[in-house]
Structure formats: structure tokens, C-alpha cells
């Protein structure tokens, strides 16, 4: 089948014909052998062909013998020259029997052709025998055109041309024989030839001239000059028996680097000057990248110009670049023995993006000589490979002049000649910092703790403000093993130590001038057993028991008072300080970490410490007030690896910032609910400090909804709201007030489960925070659009104020992440709420859901629903989906007039794209333009079918666009209102 298919393919090139014998070219007698030697036999004659050239012919016409006689004519021996099949083209004329006057019944109008193979010219007049065997019959030839002889006229007729195929041949040569058995004919010429495939170049592959040995013959090709094979086996093509190449796809050769295909893929041409080709392939030559050149033809790479370089990791097609210039505007901030350097990026980055910085330090003596700084100095995050334009340097000695050289580097800096340019800065430390703390004493030790004390050093610039204790286990190496403790007294208790372990301790003091240097390391050791401290522990147990009894009594009294207040139908309020809290009915009570004398104790109590070696940070996914938010992996021994979210505390933090950062972990660690973000643990014993929580794949709810606008059903949205309400019910039962409930603080996992997050961070935003969501109010930052009016005015945060915020979250969810109150200013929002205006229902919002929102926005906080009631109401809606099909009307009751956000008049938009962006459908701007909807006149006629054709497949998006078009039509009617102004101006 494959061979038959190859024979059916069209040919790639014309076949060549190689002549073995052509009587037209013979000028002497042919002297072919005839048999028998009798009268009436074949006769050799001379004649003229159609072109009046002299040719040798044979004629026969024996009509005398009735019954016919076989007349044989045999050519000379013809070498086949490797041909397997030979073609014979015979030119002859044949007399019509009826036109012959003496024609007998044995007159024929045909003759027969035979051939005989032999290894040499061995035939004689009698051998081989003149019969069909040993001769091999080729064909009996009949004339298509007969010559007629009319009385008194010359014979007329056409020349017959017949081509026969001989073979297959296997011996060195052959004879061709003609047998006449009663015909009157003339053999005008004989052309013996064979066919072969001519040489061929296709797809950069050369195939030689080939004589076919079989029906089809595979021929191996070779790549043309400057081409290389790219496939194994080498490319091949089939030569057919008729001398034609079978057409098939030829692949396997491509031009070498520095060469491109040309002349219809027949040659590989060298790339010209100024161009190059870096790899093997069919691509064209490319112009040299920036700052490079090629002076020679056939270049696989362009060389960099003087002063420009290409890094080893850069591809050959990348431009050549230079090292960056020096950083600019280096400034320093000195705080005692700690220095922070900051600088601006260099003017010239060298054309690269892998910019890093390196800082070198030299200590200059009064005599003028400068030496490298000592090993006691530390750089944070390091002296080299800095990606941010700052570095913190610790361990500076007082009254010393330092020279810091800041250099910018990139991927080609190591290839450049000479050192990189740098920007120097000289810093002289103050001599006023406290001296090193020495004479550390162990006043008491136990198997897990050490109590140390030391003499108060003399501070030249005033009193010592506090101390920093640095300690680590002897033999432990690396920054993760070092711990720090701050104390305001000249004593410290080191807790959580290993039994019978040796520790190295250093202390430094801080005055108004900053920190002094650390003193010499002091060796201390914990006890092996507890025999020496049992008395202290016994006293501690007794004291704890007494305190516990007192606390139980106080809690019981508070619970009774709270139950009485609840029986009067009034909600218990929470003060601004979380330390005042209630006991829930059989529920664990939230404890404010700031009620602890040492907030770090709250972290140890409620958050699990995780070894930093179990944590792997994979990528940064966001940034917060205190540092970066990353995605990573947690692999604790004996547990399955899990994906976690990691909040990190940025460098240069104060102790207050560290305490407030970790307070969120102290809060989160007290909660355990499927709709509350789960705390995995904290990393506090290494830098950076981390908080690890479960990873929520879909991120914040507001951005997730905006990204999937119109893609969720009402039931799905109500299910999300039910999960949020369930989490808030749990927090309310634990007597915790969130204060910052908003869709941005709700996280969504891959199963669309919503979980409440962000416990505490928003309460610590500083006054100079740039986040526009939070506005200053009575000394703190408040998210105005989500906060109840009593909380804005009097900072009275309660579970009822969280209910108000929950109503705003409901509106955000049903509007797919729309910003509450749109572009109204915060002051306009406050004024509108004071005048009892409320948000209108989002598009297609069920009436029951908007009514629940209005209930949450009651001015009287005691009239707002509690979270158990909210959960119950949402459960009823989910069980009765028909209630969600009643869509809210865009007007409110008498007690709750609704804010009106009318769409501006379409004439206010400069283009269709601007209109699409205004209705949050800007993603379809290019699709509208490509489909011809470029004017409002055309857009006003758009239909749902048009939207599908454009590519708007989401039903929610179709509704929004068609509703806006309908509004546009109403605006175009005569007398229609203009409808200008923002939402804050139209109530």
C-alpha cells in the first residue's frame, strides 16, 4: 500500500532519459540479423525522416507465400548500463491489407516484439533459437494508423509511434527482436532508453541522480553546504520507476548558526554584516541587538562593543549592557551604635533589571589611614546582594570615623575592567552612648530559666533608658539561634531554656544618644534538676492558687451582673480597651493580649512556636502595614506538608511594632471555627518574625468578587454571607469585637468558604498612614464607610457596630465588590448617614436581603439584629430559594431614604470605551471596537445576540450592559433629564 501511494504522488522534478540505442543517430548500416535467410525477408534501406534527415530503416512485405511466414529481425547486443527497466520507442508504418492487390488471407496488420538477455554478445544467426522461448515476448503491436494504397495514387498514411517497457532486466545486456507474420510494414526508427531521477535539492537536502532498481527506491539525502542534520535517521526520498521523485515532506536539515535559508529553501546563505543567527533552525538572520556588532558574514553571535558586556546567563539575542553608575544621594541615620544608610537608584542602570547593591566599610584612624571594619559589625540584611536601597549596620564603636562605600552592581559588573563606581559617605559615631555592660551575675537559676543582674553603666548623656539582652546556647550557630530580650531594669529573666545547657549572654544599654556596644560574652548554665528550686515552685503554686480563687469569684460576680443587664433587654457594650470582656454561656472567653504585663507571654500562651527550618517561603503575594505577605510551605515532623500564608515583620521595627504585630497571633490563636482564619503558629526566635496562617487560595473577598463579576448565583452569594455571619456569631459569643469587618478582610478558599481575618492590625494604624480606607477620628484610624455612626462619633465599638459593618459587607457581596458609597467623600458619607440615608439595593438584589441590610443599619444599635438572628434569617432564605427571586425596588421606605447613584448622561462620555469603563465593563472595550460598535448610535441598537457574538458570555455582564443601554435610550428621548452629578449630590 505504501509503494502504491508513493506511485500516486505527484513528482517533484522531471525524469531524465538515458539513451542506449537510437537508430536516428546511426549513419552506417545497422546490419541487424534476420531469420530465415530467404526471399521476402526484412530489408535494410536508407530513407528520409520527417525532418528530411537520412535514416536507416527496415521493411518487410512478403505476400507471396500463402499461410504466412515468420520473419525475424534482431538488433545488435545492447548493454543495459545498470537499468532494470528499459523503454523502447518504435516508429513504424503499416499497410492496410485491403489496399494490397495481392493480399492473402494471411495478411496481418500487427507484429510482435521480443527481447533476449545475455551477459555478453553471444548470439549468432542460429542461436538462440528463433522462438518465444528463449526469447521473452514484450507485446504484440497493432497499428493505430494504416497506410492505404489507392490505384493510380501514392500510398498515404500516418507514422505509428509505440513505446514498450522491457524488464525487469538482470544480465549485462540484451537483444531486441521483431517478428513479422504477414504484415507489410516499415520499421522507421528504434529508440532504446531508460529513465532515472535527476538530482534534486529540496528543504536544504541534496538527493543525487538515481537509477531506480525497483518500483520505488529509497534514496538517502545529505544536507547542503552550511546546513546540519537535525533528525535521525537522515532525510530520504523515494525515486520511482518512471524516473520521478515521489513527493513527500522532507525534513531533517536546518541552516547552521550564522546562516539562513534562501532561494526557496535550496541554499543556506550567510548572515550579512550587522546581522546574526544564534542557533540551528529555519529562522531568518536578525539585526544585531543593541550595543553589539558583527563585522563578518555568517556570524552566530554579535560581539559587544567596547564598554558593553553580555552576562554568561544572557542569551545571545539579548542586548549588550554596561555596569550601572554609582548610587546617588546616600544619607545616613545614626542611632548610637546602629546606623541606617539609604540611597537613590543610580542614574544609569546599564540597561539591565538585575540591579543589586553592595556596601563596604572602612574604619579611618586619626592619622588618616583606613582599614577594613572589624568582624563584630553586622549588616542587615547583608553587605552584598541588596535589592532594596537601604542597609542597617549594627555594632559601631563610639567616637570612630567610618567610611561606607555604596556600589551598584548588575549581571555584567564582574566582566567590566576596574572596580565598580561607588558613592562614599563618612560617619563619625557619638562618644555619648553608654559604655559596654560588664560584670553580669547569675542571681538565680533553674532547669529552664536564668535570672541575671548587672551593674548600671555610667551614661555620659544621661540616665540609661533600657537594656537589650542577647543570648544563645553555646555551640549553636546562625542568626536563628540568637534571641533578644529587652528590659527597663538592670536585671532580666531568661525563660524557655534547655535543662543543663550552657548559654552565652551579652548586654548593652541605651540612653538618649542610642545603644552602646554589647559587653563581653558571659557564660551561664541552667540546672540539671529542680531540687534546688522546689521551695520557690511550691510558693509559686500556692500563690497561683490564691489568685485563681480570687479570679473565679470576680468572674462569677461579673457574670451575674451581665445576666441581669441582658434580662433588661439591653446589649452589653465593650469599652475601647479589649481588656473588658464577658463570659459567654458555656463558651470560651476572649482574653486581650494587652492585659498581660508582658505581651510576649500571651504569644507563648496562645500561639505555637514553629521552628524556622520547617518553613519555606515561595513567593511574595502582597504587602501589609508591618511587612510582606508571602505564600509558603510548612512541613513539620510527622505531619503532612501544607500550604500557608506568611506575614513577615519588616526590618528596622521598634519593640512596640513587634508587640502589635504579634498581638494578631495572640488573638487568632484563641479562635477555632470553620469561618475564622486558622493560626498555624509563629516564628519569633529568628529574623524575620513571622505569623503563619492557613492559605486561602482565592484571596480577599472584594477583589475575588470583582474578578468574577456576575459569575455566581444569588444562592451562592447568600451561602458566602451565611459563612461570614457564622464566624461573626462565634466571635460575638467569645465577646470579641472585630471593629474592621469588611469584604477586604474576608478571605476565600478554593471551595468558596469565607473566613473572617485581620484581627487587630487595623487598630494600630498610625496617624501618618497613607491608606485612604482609614480616616482619623478621635486619635485613631477608622474605616468610615464600614463603621457604625456611634463608633465614628464616640468610638463606641460593640457587637452591634460589627452588625452595621456586616450590612455593608452584604452590600459589597451582592454588588460583586462595588465600593460602598462609590466616590463620595468620607465626610459626605457621614453627613448622609446622619440624615438617615442608606445604600440602595445592588442590581438584582433580592428584597429580603436588602431589608436585612437595612435592619443592620438601624440608627439605634439595640434595634439591630444580633448575629445568631442574622444566621437564622440567612438559613431561612437558603431553605426557601423562592424568597430570593423577589428583586428589590430602587426606593426605600419612609424611614430609610436610599442614596441614588444615577448613571451620567451618555453625552458626558467621550467614547464608547469610556462608557464601558464607567459601568465596570472596560474588559470588553477592544471587543466592541473590533465588532464595529464604536459610536453611541450603534451601541443603542445592540442586542443580546450581538453581545454573544462580541464575546460577552456571562449573563450578569449582559444584563449590566443592556440595562445601561436601555438607560441611554431613555436619556436620548426628548425631555429626558440630563442626569449629571455624582452620587453624593443626588439623594
UniProtKB/Swiss-Prot annotation:
The chain crosses the membrane at residues 540-560. Residues 615-899 form the Protein kinase domain. Keywords: Angiogenesis, ATP-binding, Cell membrane, Developmental protein, Disulfide bond, Glycoprotein, Kinase, Membrane, Nucleotide-binding, Phosphoprotein, Receptor, Repeat, Signal, Transferase, Transmembrane, Transmembrane helix, Tyrosine-protein kinase. Expressed in various organ systems, including lung, liver, kidney, intestine, muscle and heart. Expressed in myogenic progenitor cells. Its main location: membrane. It is a single-pass type I membrane protein. Pfam families: EphA2_TM, Ephrin_lbd, Ephrin_rec_like, fn3, PK_Tyr_Ser-Thr, SAM_1. Residues 561-987 are cytoplasmic. It catalyses: L-tyrosyl-[protein] + ATP = O-phospho-L-tyrosyl-[protein] + ADP + H(+). Phosphorylated; autophosphorylation is stimulated by EFNB2. The keyword Kinase applies. It is an enzyme of class 2 (transferase). It comes from the Eukaryota. It is found in: Cell membrane. Residues 1-15 form the signal peptide. The modification Phosphoserine is found at residues 769-770, 911, 943. The keyword Kinase applies. One of its GO terms (molecular function) is transmembrane receptor protein tyrosine kinase activity. GO terms for biological process: angiogenesis; cell adhesion; cell migration involved in sprouting angiogenesis; ephrin receptor signaling pathway; heart morphogenesis; positive regulation of aorta morphogenesis; positive regulation of T cell costimulation; protein autophosphorylation. Belongs to the protein kinase superfamily. Tyr protein kinase family. Ephrin receptor subfamily. Heterotetramer upon binding of the ligand. The heterotetramer is composed of an ephrin dimer and a receptor dimer. Oligomerization is probably required to induce biological responses. Interacts with RASA1; the interaction depends on EPHB4 tyrosine-phosphorylation. Receptor tyrosine kinase which binds promiscuously transmembrane ephrin-B family ligands residing on adjacent cells, leading to contact-dependent bidirectional signaling into neighboring cells. The signaling pathway downstream of the receptor is referred to as forward signaling while the signaling pathway downstream of the ephrin ligand is referred to as reverse signaling. This is Ephrin type-B receptor 4. It comes from Mus musculus. The gene is Ephb4.
Amino acid at each position: 500500500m505504501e509503494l502504491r501511494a508513493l506511485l500516486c504522488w505527484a513528482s517533484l522534478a522531471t525524469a531524465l532519459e538515458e539513451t542506449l540505442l537510437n537508430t536516428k543517430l546511426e549513419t552506417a548500416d545497422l546490419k541487424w540479423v534476420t531469420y530465415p535467410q530467404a526471399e521476402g525477408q526484412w530489408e535494410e534501406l536508407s530513407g528520409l525522416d520527417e525532418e528530411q534527415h537520412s535514416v536507416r530503416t527496415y521493411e518487410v512485405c512478403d505476400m507471396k507465400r500463402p499461410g504466412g511466414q515468420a520473419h525475424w529481425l534482431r538488433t545488435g547486443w545492447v548493454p543495459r548500463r545498470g537499468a532494470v527497466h528499459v523503454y523502447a520507442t518504435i516508429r513504424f508504418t503499416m499497410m492496410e491489407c485491403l489496399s494490397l492487390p495481392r493480399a492473402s488471407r494471411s495478411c496481418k496488420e500487427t507484429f510482435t516484439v521480443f527481447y533476449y538477455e545475455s551477459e555478453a554478445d553471444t548470439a549468432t544467426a542460429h542461436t538462440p533459437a528463433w522462438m518465444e522461448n528463449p526469447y521473452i515476448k514484450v507485446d504484440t503491436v497493432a497499428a493505430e494508423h494504416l497506410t492505404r494504397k489507392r490505384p493510380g495514387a501514392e500510398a498515404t498514411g500516418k507514422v505509428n509511434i509505440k513505446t514498450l517497457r522491457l524488464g525487469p532486466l538482470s544480465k549485462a545486456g540484451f537483444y531486441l527482436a521483431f517478428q513479422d507474420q504477414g504484415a507489410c510494414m516499415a520499421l522507421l526508427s528504434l529508440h532504446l532508453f531508460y529513465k532515472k531521477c535527476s538530482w534534486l535539492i529540496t528543504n536544504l537536502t541534496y538527493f543525487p541522480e538515481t537509477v531506480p532498481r525497483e518500483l520505488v527506491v529509497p534514496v538517502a539525502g545529505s544536507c547542503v553546504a552550511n546546513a546540519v542534520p537535525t533528525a535521525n535517521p537522515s532525510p530520504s526520498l523515494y525515486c520511482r520507476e518512471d524516473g520521478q521523485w515521489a513527493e513527500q515532506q522532507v525534513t531533517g536539515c536546518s541552516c547552521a548558526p550564522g546562516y539562513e535559508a534562501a532561494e526557496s529553501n535550496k541554499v543556506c546563505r550567510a548572515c550579512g554584516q550587522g546581522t546574526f543567527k544564534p542557533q540551528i533552525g529555519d529562522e531568518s538572520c536578525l539585526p544585531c541587538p543593541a550595543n553589539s556588532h558583527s563585522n563578518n558574514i555568517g556570524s552566530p553571535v554579535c560581539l559587544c562593543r567596547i564598554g558593553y558586556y553580555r552576562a554568561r546567563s544572557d542569551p545571545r539575542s539579548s542586548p549588550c549592557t554596561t555596569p550601572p553608575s554609582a548610587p546617588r544621594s546616600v544619607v545616613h541615620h545614626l542611632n548610637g551604635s546602629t546606623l541606617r544608610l539609604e540611597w537613590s537608584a543610580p542614574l544609569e542602570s546599564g540597561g539591565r533589571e538585575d540591579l543589586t547593591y553592595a556596601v563596604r566599610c572602612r574604619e579611618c584612624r586619626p592619622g588618616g589611614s583606613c582599614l577594613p571594619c572589624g568582624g563584630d559589625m553586622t549588616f542587615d540584611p547583608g553587605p552584598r546582594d541588596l535589592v532594596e536601597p537601604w542597609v542597617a549596620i549594627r555594632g559601631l564603636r563610639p567616637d570612630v570615623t567610618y567610611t561606607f562605600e555604596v556600589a551598584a552592581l548588575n549581571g555584567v559588573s564582574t566582566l567590566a575592567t576596574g572596580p565598580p563606581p561607588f558613592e562614599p559617605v563618612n560617619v563619625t559615631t557619638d562618644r555619648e552612648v553608654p559604655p559596654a555592660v560588664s560584670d553580669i551575675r547569675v542571681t538565680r537559676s533553674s532547669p529552664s530559666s536564668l535570672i541575671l543582674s548587672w551593674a548600671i553603666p555610667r551614661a555620659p548623656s544621661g540616665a540609661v533608658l533600657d537594656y537589650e539582652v542577647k543570648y544563645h546556647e553555646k555551640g549553636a550557630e546562625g542568626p536563628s539561634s540568637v534571641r533578644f530580650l529587652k528590659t527597663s531594669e538592670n536585671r532580666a529573666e531568661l525563660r524557655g531554656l534547655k535543662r543543663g545547657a550552657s548559654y552565652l549572654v551579652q548586654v548593652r544599654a541605651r540612653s538618649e544618644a542610642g545603644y552602646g556596644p554589647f559587653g563581653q560574652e558571659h557564660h551561664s548554665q541552667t540546672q540539671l534538676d529542680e531540687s534546688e528550686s522546689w521551695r520557690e515552685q511550691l510558693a509559686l503554686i500556692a500563690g497561683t492558687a490564691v489568685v485563681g480563687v480570687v479570679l473565679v469569684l470576680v468572674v462569677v460576680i461579673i457574670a451575674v451582673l451581665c445576666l441581669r443587664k441582658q434580662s433588661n433587654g439591653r446589649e452589653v457594650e465593650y469599652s475601647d480597651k479589649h481588656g473588658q470582656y464577658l463570659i459567654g454561656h458555656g463558651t470560651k472567653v476572649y482574653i486581650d493580649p494587652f492585659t498581660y504585663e508582658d505581651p510576649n507571654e500571651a504569644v507563648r500562651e496562645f500561639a505555637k512556636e514553629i521552628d524556622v527550618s520547617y518553613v519555606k517561603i515561595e513567593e511574595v503575594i502582597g504587602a501589609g502595614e508591618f511587612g510582606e505577605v508571602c505564600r509558603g510551605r510548612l512541613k513539620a515532623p510527622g505531619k503532612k506538608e501544607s500550604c500557608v500564608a506568611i506575614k513577615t515583620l519588616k526590618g528596622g521595627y521598634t519593640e512596640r511594632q513587634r508587640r502589635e504585630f504579634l498581638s494578631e497571633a495572640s488573638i487568632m490563636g484563641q479562635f477555632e471555627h470553620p469561618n475564622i482564619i486558622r493560626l498555624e503558629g509563629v516564628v519569633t526566635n529568628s529574623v524575620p518574625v513571622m505569623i503563619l496562617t492557613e492559605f486561602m487560595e482565592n484571596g480577599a473577598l472584594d477583589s475575588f468578587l470583582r474578578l468574577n463579576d456576575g459569575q455566581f448565583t444569588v444562592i451562592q452569594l447568600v451561602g458566602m454571607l451565611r459563612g461570614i455571619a457564622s464566624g461573626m456569631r462565634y466571635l460575638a459569643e467569645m465577646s470579641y469585637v472585630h471593629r474592621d469587618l469588611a469584604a477586604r478582610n474576608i478571605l476565600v478558599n478554593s471551595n468558596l468558604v469565607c473566613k473572617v481575618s485581620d484581627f487587630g492590625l487595623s487598630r494600630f494604624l498610625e496617624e501618618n498612614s497613607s491608606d485612604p480606607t482609614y480616616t482619623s477620628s478621635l486619635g485613631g484610624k477608622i474605616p468610615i464607610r464600614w463603621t457604625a455612626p456611634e463608633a465614628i462619633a464616640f468610638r463606641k465599638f460593640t457587637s452591634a457596630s460589627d452588625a452595621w459593618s456586616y450590612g455593608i459587607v452584604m452590600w459589597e457581596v451582592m454588588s460583586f465588590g462595588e465600593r460602598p458609597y462609590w466616590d463620595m467623600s468620607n465626610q459626605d458619607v457621614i453627613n448622609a448617614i446622619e440624615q438617615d440615608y442608606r445604600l440602595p439595593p445592588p442590581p438584582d438584589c433580592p428584597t429580603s436581603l436588602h431589608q436585612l441590610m437595612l435592619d443592620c443599619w438601624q440608627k439605634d444599635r439595640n434595634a439591630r439584629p444580633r448575629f445568631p438572628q442574622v444566621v437564622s434569617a440567612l438559613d431561612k432564605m437558603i431553605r426557601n430559594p423562592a424568597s430570593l427571586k423577589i428583586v428589590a425596588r430602587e426606593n426605600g421606605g419612609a424611614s430609610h431614604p436610599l442614596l441614588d447613584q444615577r448613571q451620567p448622561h451618555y453625552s458626558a462620555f467621550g467614547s464608547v470605551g469610556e462608557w464601558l469603563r464607567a459601568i465596570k465593563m472596560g474588559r470588553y472595550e477592544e471587543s466592541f471596537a473590533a465588532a464595529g460598535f464604536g459610536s453611541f448610535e450603534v451601541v443603542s441598537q445592540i442586542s443580546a445576540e450581538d453581545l454573544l457574538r462580541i464575546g460577552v458570555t456571562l449573563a450578569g455582564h449582559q444584563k449590566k450592559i443592556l440595562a445601561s443601554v436601555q438607560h441611554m435610550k431613555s436619556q436620548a428621548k426628548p425631555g429626558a433629564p440630563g442626569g449629571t452629578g455624582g452620587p453624593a449630590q443626588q439623594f
